[in-house]
Amino acid sequence: MDEQQDCLHPINIKKFNDSPLTLSFKNITSKVTCNKKNKNKVILNDVSGTFHSGRLTAILGPSGAGKTTLLNILAGYKSKGVTGSVLVNNQPRVAHDFQWQSCCIGQDAALLPLLTTHETLLIAADLKMSSKISTKQKQKIVSDIADLLGLQKAMDTRVSKLSGGEVKRLSIGVELVTNPPIMFFDEPTSGLDSVSSGQVVSHLRNLAQGGRTVVCVIHQPSSRIFDMFDDLYVVANGRIIYGGPVSDMVAVFQSAGFKCPHYYNRADFALEVASCEIVGDVDSLLEKALNHSQTSILTNNTNVIDENSTEKDSAVHEGSSRSSSDSQKKFEKEDSSSVILPIDQESEERKIPVHKRQTYAISYWRQFTILLTRSSTCTFRDMQLATLRLIMHGLVGVALGLVYYHIGNEASKIISNTAFLFFILLFIFFANSMPTVLTFPQEAAVFQRESLNNWYSLPAYYFSKIIADLPLQMLCPTLFMLVSYFMTDQPADCFRVTMVWAVCVLFTIISQGLGLLAGVAFDPQLALFVLPAATIPMLMFSGFFIRFDELPAYMHPFSYTSYFGYGFEAIIQTVYGYDRPKLICSEPFCQFTQPSRYLKEIGIRYTYKEDLMFLSGFIVFIYILLYAVLKFRLWKSRW
């Protein structure tokens, strides 16, 4: 315990003009529809309670008891099928205000693995704090948070190289930059050993003692960790059977006939009571918990933080991004030498009418530039994947060139050359869509966490992601196409090369867009099946395996949905159209020495420009759909 406290490096600094908040919930009931008959399953049943500032509160209970559901409701992430009320300082919670007043850190610490600890914290500060705050002040804030959470030695270490405990602490630090008075944690010790778990909870306790309302869903804590909590709520079958100080739990349980053995872990004892493994009067516990919650809500005694405690235990900084422009000016006038601050007095910012507050701390353009820089850094820093993609495009281009070597000008090998041109599209599609299916879900989880905690807007992230991917999207097909194109002796006219290159780039964008769409819409395992399966019809109606005019009439509408068809038509027209001279015939008879005759034979439907317009239309449609799915994912996470 002493070693853990030594890691915290408490900083004595001046107070932050912010008022502590007490969070109350009353008669919360949550139901979900569990089958086609619209039968409702009760997850939470009329639960009430109060979380006080300055105290570290644990929510404990067996699996399926409703702990995480309660946390999501209180954090504002879930509203569908929920009744009851949530109060902040005995006033109804205002959703817009609560986004600035709270943050929620999930069980899985979703962070970008290619950024360093320092970059992660600094980008969080840039996104969550006003642009009026200087870089020097932000650097000071980042440094103080690193000191507070014991991350100074890992500042130049990539997230992928951090230990589990360091990742957990970093996930706390990125939210800490805005000094939220209410913090929610879903199983912050999951996946950690006992020492790392103790360090994390010790940090949370210090944050609470700085004046925050800190609430944790916890699962089977050790006795030492359990003793760090001030208050406890025990949830069983959707009901709260205990809510109050940890020190009173054993006595309350004993009064209801549940006796805790000597030298027994009180957390295990509470779980056994909640799981009905110990015989006693559960109804008595429910009644006591109800009476306690009603008394607590009525009195709603806001804890006043002891002066000595607030000076000893630090929280975050005085330049909270949730403050208005007036409070930002006030921050700039204050001494910036100490920026890690406990919550204390009434904030002028909260006196400003809600409609005058900004939705985000910085402008949309500023969000876009920061996110674009971050995405570009991650894209080019992932050299293993980027290099592998480039090497594979080059090697496959060479292999394809060797297989179809110098057939591009041979009339007798025109069918084989057509297969080569189709294979270009086939390789580009799978080489650019499949890797994205595996890599994007991790980034999407980071986006979801940051967006739910009000870091930035969806459009800013969306456009930064698209633009950051463009350089690699253009470089890979360019390398592949140029190598294979000239090795196979295709026409070297500059306009033809440019036209084929344009089709390849557009097809790459389509492919990566579909990979992003599958990655965000499905689990990775399911996406790996769905994407190839959905591609099969596109290949069938491409015009390569069967001519369009030979399709049954009822199949014609489906042929218009094949992006492979438009890409194939565009390339084949570029290579054999535009008055190309006669091909070389090395055999006694060649049917298609005239390229125009071959184009007529295979049944070209549209001009090159029309095919490019259709491909561009597919790009617009796919990326609009991607935006809609991302927006739906955010909406669903709040339900």
Task: Give the residues covered by each predicted segment.
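ABC ATPase C-loop
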Residues: E175-L176
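Catalytic Walker B motif of ABC-type/P-loop ATPase nucleotide-binding domains
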Residues: M183-E187
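Conserved ABC transporter NBD signature motif
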Residues: G49-H52, A75-G76, V82-W100
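Q-loop/switch helix immediately C-terminal to the Walker
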Residues: C104, D108, P113-S130, I141
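Short, conserved post-Walker A segment of ABC-type ATPase nucleotide-binding domains
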Residues: T57, T68-S79
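Topological signature of polytopic alpha-helical transporters
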Residues: M1-K41, N45-S48, S53, P62, ...
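Conserved ABC ATPase signature
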Residues: R158-L162
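Membrane-spanning alpha-helical segments of multipass transporters and channels
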Residues: I241, S255-G257, F380-R638
